[in-house]
């Protein structure tokens, strides 16, 4: 079990895997159930004055995340990210003055994300309907309406 980290709901997780838009990894809050992760992930328990959802929203923009991590991360020969869990916390993060304000901001953006997801599903269903209607109106060669 020493090769794994325990992640609790509300913890902040740093994924030390380079991605196209995030070459230094990503930072997310665990909004789901507790679980375990490999040592390739840095797991952080937030302080009493810091809200995990706010921290995730703070790092939502690729440019801000990359600017935060760039000076802290060294890239290895195989494009691995060489950074200790402690070093990942060395950068400056501008938090809202109070925990309640951070929580409200995090909830606001969560609500927006949920609304976007809802509208995306509606859009996807309308795209399927449009395709079906076009196929019925304009059948392929040799087909009848």
PLM region spans:
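Feature detects amphipathic, helix-rich regulatory segments
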Residues: 1-145
């Amino acid at each position: 079990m020493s090769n794994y980290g325990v992640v609790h709901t509300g913890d902040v997780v740093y994924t030390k895997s380079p991605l196209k838009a995030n070459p230094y990894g990503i930072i997310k809050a665990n909004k789901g159930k507790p679980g375990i992760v490999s040592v390739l992930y840095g797991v952080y328990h937030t302080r009493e004055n810091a809200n995990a959802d706010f921290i995730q929203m703070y790092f939502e923009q690729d440019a801000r995340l990359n600017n935060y991590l760039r000076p802290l991360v060294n890239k290895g020969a195989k494009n691995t990210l060489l950074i200790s869990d402690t070093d990942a916390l060395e950068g400056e993060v501008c938090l809202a003055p109070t925990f309640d304000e951070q929580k409200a901001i995090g909830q606001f953006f969560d609500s927006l994300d949920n609304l976007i997801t809802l509208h995306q599903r509606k859009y996807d269903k309308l795209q399927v309907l449009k395709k079906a209607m076009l196929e019925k109106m304009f059948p392929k060669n040799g087909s009848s309406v």
